[in-house]
Structure formats: C-alpha cells, structure tokens
UniProtKB/Swiss-Prot annotation:
The gene is thiE2. The keyword Transferase applies. Condenses 4-methyl-5-(beta-hydroxyethyl)thiazole monophosphate (THZ-P) and 2-methyl-4-amino-5-hydroxymethyl pyrimidine pyrophosphate (HMP-PP) to form thiamine monophosphate (TMP). It comes from Aquifex aeolicus (strain VF5). Its cofactor is Mg(2+). This is Putative thiamine-phosphate synthase 2.
C-alpha cells in the first residue's frame, strides 16, 4: 500500500473547541492520514473521540492511526497505530494484526533502524527544526533527515517545526512525506 504524503497529528489544545470541525477542514485540504494523539484523555473519552474521528476519516477515505493505544485502535477499527520511541516493538502489533499500519517515532538513525528491523511501516523523524510542540527538544536538522532517509528502506516523514515554506527542502533531503500538527492549521 502506498502511504499518503501528508500526515496530520491531532492536538485538541491547538485545534480549539471545534475539534471535529478543525479536523474536517484539514481533511478537506487533502490530508489522507491522521494520527489521533490525545494522551491526556481517559480511556472512555479517547474511545468516544476515536469513534467520531474514525467516522470522519472514513468519509474522506483517510487512514486513521491511534497513538500507542492498540486496544482503542482495534475497538474503532482504525487502520493502525503510531508508536512512541519508548513503546513496545512494532513486531508485537504485527503479530496480533499483520494488516495494521504501524508508524514509529524516531529521533535518530539508530531508532529508525530499530523501527525498520522490528517491522514498522514508516517512521516520523523529529524534530527536524525547532518546534513549539516540544520547545526543549534540540533539532536534528536536514543532514540527519537525509542520512536516515538514505539508510532505511521504509518511508520517512519529516516532523517538527515544518512549515509550508520548508516542505520542499525536506523532500530534497529525502523525506517521503511531511507530518505535523500546527502546519495543517494554517
């Protein structure tokens, strides 16, 4: 399966009061892969929101991945999960559901290679640039993006401080796609 090039990551605090309306605007712009990443929600709240997001992503024929919560992903019939770097290995997900798309958050060449070896379908590599989402994180830069993109055989999504003006330079440095939170709100 060919993955979409744009990957939106949700953030209720940045989306504002009309979460689903904001997400629908993003989908109307052509984004076809969404990660529901709302770590602060309790199980029942996350499940309820995930069901609503699943209905919306189906309407736009977009893929839905749930951040780390394999149980919620199964319950709402999402297309897969996105695993943080310190989460369980992608191979565990693939063993339970071989059809699930598994994304993995990598922050170095080492973790990108680990993700590939463990069966991840793609990685997000971050932060490429300084980002408001994680102001304490040191940017890894375009050189690392290029190196990782050349040394792994799975799609690499550039993430972190990406603006519409920086997309082209990310693609020039090997990015398969672009992931982000704020950029899709512009």
């Amino acid at each position: 399966m060919e993955l979409p090039r744009l990957y939106a990551i949700t953030d209720r605090k940045k989306y504002g009061e009309n979460f689903l309306e904001t997400l629908e605007k993003i989908l109307k712009k052509g984004v076809r892969m969404v990660q529901l990443r709302e770590k602060d929600l309790k199980d029942r709240e996350l499940y309820k929101l995930a069901k609503e997001v699943r209905a919306l992503t189906k309407k736009y024929k977009a893929l839905l991945l749930i951040n780390e919560r394999f149980d919620i992903a199964l319950a709402v019939e999402a297309d897969g999960v996105h695993l943080p770097e310190q989460s369980f290995p992608p191979s565990v997900v693939k063993r339970v559901n071989p059809n699930f798309i598994v994304g993995f958050s990598a922050h170095s060449l080492e973790s990108a290679k680990y993700a590939e070896k463990e069966g991840a379908d793609f990685i997000t590599l971050s932060p490429i640039f300084k980002t408001s989402s994680h102001p304490e994180a040191q940017p890894i830069g375009l050189k690392t993006l290029k190196e990782v993109s050349e040394k792994v055989n799975i799609p690499v999504y550039a993430l972190g401080g990406i603006t519409w003006e920086k997309i082209k330079v990310c693609y020039k440095n090997g990015a398969y796609g672009i992931a982000g939170i704020s950029m899709f709100l512009e």
